[in-house]
Amino acid sequence: MHRYRSHTCEELRPSDVGGTVRLSGWVHRVRDHGGLLFIDLRDHYGITQIVADPDSPSFSTAEKLRSEWVIRVDGEVKARTPETVNPNLATGGVEVFAREIEVLSQAKELPLPVFGEPDYPEDIRLKYRFLDLRRETLHRNILARTKIIAEMRKRMAESGFTEFSTPILTASSPEGARDFLVPSRLHQGKFYALPQAPQIYKQLIMVSGFDRYFQIAPCFRDEDPRADRLPGEFYQLDLEMSFVTQEDVFSTMEPVMRGIFEAFAEGKPVTQKLPRIPYDEAMRKYGSDKPDLRNPIVMEEVSEHFRGSGFKVFANILANDPKAEVWAIPAKTGGSRAFCDRMNSWAQGEGQPGLGYIFWRKEGDTLEGAGPIAKNIGPERTDAIRTQLGLGDGDACFFVAGDPKKFVAFAGAARTRAGEELNLVDRDRFELAWIVDFPFYEWNEDEKRIEFGHNPFSMPQGGMEALENQEPLSIKAFQYDLVCNGFEIASGGIRNHMPELMVKAFEVAGFDRQMVEERFGGLYRAFQYGAPPHGGMAAGIDRIVMLLRGAKNLREITMFPMNQQAMDLLMGAPSEATPQQLRELHIRLAPKQD
């Protein structure tokens, strides 16, 4: 028999009754029932119940066992009595009567419980991550992550993609975040950078004559902590394709992404035909470029109903600013003053003056609008708003007014808040959609200049003619995002593969040819030797796993994450370098600032 086990702790079934087995694992818990000791023995695969009775030579050892000791058990498989069968365990029909127990490793008193999953301070969980990972939910999440990545690889290979690895030590490039810099020992005063994404390398792979590339790529960004992104590093399914249009990317990747969700959705419906929603439409209807389409609320413009009306606040805003609009946020079933007042208080907590509203209720046989706005604009305008929005008895509507560019984010947040408060969001499905036609440029109000809206390497719609003749802020990009349930899970574009077009695009954003040649010399040179039209995308693996597992944050699906202060509490990183290490790197530390 094997030194440690003949079976795993998940394998034994009633068909094994009568056999002698050897199991090894962790002591999950010990229970004393009238002199009999019941030990739940756990390994990577599952749990088996061990029984030690006072007549067994193993009993004296069993009495000493404590949680998370590692033991080996030899014993006989017996059937449980009908009343003791545990239907929640794969091995719940049997138990092993111990003949011999060997302690392989003892455990100190635990700093956090492994049995059960009570809430525990996150810093303790991260410091003792090796214990935290023994807990059932986290253990399953990590295994699911591995299976999801394996499914990605399988589907990409089936779609004709080849997996390539790109360098981890590379040159710094402006991708929208700070680089992690690595000092060079051999080249004094110079630094490598960890890649924020394999963007330039994957385009060079296309120029090199390969047709379809992908990799499970680690990406590194020195960003301030955010709730929806792990500090330091994250992983993405990165891909690129030659000789493709935007629709080619969609038709290739839609079955892959939909299939991954279907494989791990545990029966929840997944969007079959993904809609293409223009960016401007997404902002107008949902107040977000990553809308949660499970929320049925669709915002509409209702400016005409307020122009010249008795509600002077909105009427004056419209009269004094040609850019001003009034948007309506319809809220079916929200027609109570208590709910409307809660929404108004929430808006004030968000730094807004309030949130105007109308709600409708039956007064006898008449459907009437209620609230300050309804009183000021009168029944005819109130009813016109209700008719436009398709609302009725027991429904409500909220309003925001001003320059849409300034209030759109708040309007989107109000839509989300109303949908959640009214339980309008169906949480048992995955709603996927493509967001397309992103602005190529945007206006930086702080610096008073035009800058790239998203990826500077995307192809502008209209090409050189658009760059030379169109107002820059009106130019759209062949840029797209894949969104799911309010999260951006992938982003991509058709690339600008022509060197002069690339230079012109950067010139519009205020950069000259010399800067392009210096910062992107490898790509710029490559484009001068025959570059194919190409495009691709990158999907955030961490977010996809989080969504599929229903995890509350990204740390719940990552094996060894940092905390929100970008510290690895388990390994003690970042740490100070030794004087010798600093000398070899030609680095002298400046005095710490108070």
From Swiss-Prot:
Enzyme superclass (EC): ligase
Pfam families reported for this sequence: GAD, tRNA-synt_2, tRNA_anti-codon
One cellular component term from this protein's GO annotations in UniProt: cytoplasm
Main location: cytoplasm
UniProt key word Protein biosynthesis: yes
Residue numbers binding L-aspartate: E175, R221, H454, R495
Site description Important for tRNA non-discrimination, residues in chain: H33
Subcellular location: Cytoplasm
Gene3D superfamilies xrefs: Bira Bifunctional Protein, Domain 2, GAD-like domain, Nucleic acid-binding proteins
Keywords assigned: Aminoacyl-tRNA synthetase, ATP-binding, Cytoplasm, Ligase, Nucleotide-binding, Protein biosynthesis
CDD domains: AspRS_core, EcAspRS_like_N
Catalysis performed (reactions): tRNA(Asx) + L-aspartate + ATP = L-aspartyl-tRNA(Asx) + AMP + diphosphate
Region (Aspartate): 199-202
Record SUPFAM superfamilies: Class II aaRS and biotin synthetases, GAD domain-like, Nucleic acid-binding proteins
GO biological process: aspartyl-tRNA aminoacylation
EC number(s) from the headed UniProt entry: 6.1.1.23
GO molecular function terms listed in the Swiss-Prot or TrEMBL record: aspartate-tRNA ligase activity; aspartate-tRNA(Asn) ligase activity; ATP binding; nucleic acid binding
Domain of life according to the entry: Bacteria
InterPro entries found in the cross-reference section: Aa-tRNA-synt_II, aa-tRNA-synth_II, aa-tRNA-synth_II/BPL/LPL, Asp-tRNA-ligase_1, Asp-tRNA-ligase_1_N, Asp/Asn-tRNA-synth_IIb, AspRS_core, GAD-like_sf
Quaternary structure and partners: Homodimer.
PANTHER family referenced in this protein's UniProt entry, alphabetically: ASPARTATE--TRNA LIGASE, MITOCHONDRIAL, ASPARTYL/LYSYL-TRNA SYNTHETASE
Similarity section: Belongs to the class-II aminoacyl-tRNA synthetase family. Type 1 subfamily.
Record's function text: Aspartyl-tRNA synthetase with relaxed tRNA specificity since it is able to aspartylate not only its cognate tRNA(Asp) but also tRNA(Asn). Reaction proceeds in two steps: L-aspartate is first activated by ATP to form Asp-AMP and then transferred to the acceptor end of tRNA(Asp/Asn).
NCBIfam families: aspS_bact (TIGR00459), PRK00476.1 (NF001750)
The name this protein goes by in its record: Aspartate--tRNA(Asp/Asn) ligase
Source species: Chelativorans sp. (strain BNC1)
